[in-house]
Amino acid sequence: MAHKFVVTAFLTGSRILGRSFVAAYKQAQAASAYQRAQVKAGNTTGGASLSSGMTLDEACKILNVKPPAGGQANVEEVLSRYKRLFDANDPQKGGSFYLQSKIVRAKERFEREIGPLREKMEAEAEIKEGFKPKVYKD
């Protein structure tokens, strides 16, 4: 009689555990499919913002700069705004560590966005000017 109860409890527990694993797998598949659809639909910045959780628009609003259009971005302006805001929010001067970390994440997000564009522009400029190796004379 006791073995019947143990077997029933084991089977019921196994069924519950199996259903929960199936539900978790379906949820993970749906999230993965959604992410692939976002990337395929042209939202290529979605994958880049996963690590910081910040969009490019949010980063531009925090740093109070215009979003880079066609690879044209004023890097000096971004860095000067970053330094000014970072120093203004120094916790030892009465600022907020939370705001300071948001400013750092905004700069990192902006750099991650314009990094490949800058490399591409530098490569095009090098091709246009021709390859000029640095020659060292002893």
From Swiss-Prot:
Membrane topology: Peripheral membrane protein
Keyword Transport recorded: yes
Region ranges (J-like): 58-115
Subcellular location: Mitochondrion inner membrane
A biological-process GO annotation: protein import into mitochondrial matrix
Cysteines engaged in disulfide bonds, as pairs: none
Subunit field text: Heterodimer with PAM18. Component of the PAM complex, at least composed of mtHsp70, MGE1, TIM44, PAM16, PAM17 and PAM18.
Entry note about domains: The J-like region, although related to the J domain does not stimulate ATPase activity of mtHSP70. It nevertheless mediates the heterodimerization with the J domain of PAM18 and is therefore essential for PAM complex function.
Function (record text): Essential component of the PAM complex, a complex required for the translocation of transit peptide-containing proteins from the inner membrane into the mitochondrial matrix in an ATP-dependent manner. In the complex, it is required to regulate activity of mtHSP70 (SSC1) via its interaction with PAM18/TIM14. May act by positioning PAM18/TIM14 in juxtaposition to mtHSP70 at the translocon to maximize ATPase stimulation.
Sequence similarity: Belongs to the TIM16/PAM16 family.
Name of the featured protein: Mitochondrial import inner membrane translocase subunit TIM16
Species annotation: Gibberella zeae (strain ATCC MYA-4620 / CBS 123657 / FGSC 9075 / NRRL 31084 / PH-1) (Wheat head blight fungus)
